[in-house]
Amino acid sequence: MNDSEFHRLADQLWLTIEEHLDDWDGDSDIDCEINGGVLTITFENGSKIIINRQEPLHQVWLATKQGGYHFDLKGDEWICDRSGETFWDLLEQAATQQAGETVSFR
């Protein structure tokens, strides 16, 4: 994967997250902000999830209250380089815990 392909795929990821949060109709207040290559999700309780792109490594990094995760693209899925879990699974787990209600991005 070259840098432009990586950015295109990361942009798609950001857009999917942003669209799901724009359509969010849960009880919790969840805000999303993109600044440069960093996407910040802020929850009503003040906690945050930070997602950023690591261009030199062609990775997406996810920082949550539960920990930090690094994802490589394998096929058409972003996969955690430690646990083998998908980006979407870990993001949904963290967002659900931090929002206090079920949050889905799929």
Curated annotation (Swiss-Prot):
GO MF term set: ferric iron binding; ferrous iron binding
Top-level taxon in the UniProt lineage: Bacteria
GO cellular component annotations of the record: cytosol
GO biological process terms held by the UniProt record: iron-sulfur cluster assembly
InterPro entries xrefs: CyaY (IPR047584), Frataxin/CyaY (IPR002908), Frataxin/CyaY_sf (IPR036524), Frataxin_CS (IPR020895)
SMART domains assigned to the protein according to its UniProt record, in alphabetical order: Frataxin_Cyay
Keyword Iron: yes
Pfam name, any one: Frataxin_Cyay
Coiled coil (residue ranges): none
Keywords: Iron, Metal-binding
Protein role: Involved in iron-sulfur (Fe-S) cluster assembly. May act as a regulator of Fe-S biogenesis.
Family statement drawn from the similarity comment of this UniProt entry: Belongs to the frataxin family.
Record protein name field: Iron-sulfur cluster assembly protein CyaY
Gene source species: Escherichia coli O1:K1 / APEC
Taxonomic lineage of the native organism: Bacteria, Pseudomonadati, Pseudomonadota, Gammaproteobacteria, Enterobacterales
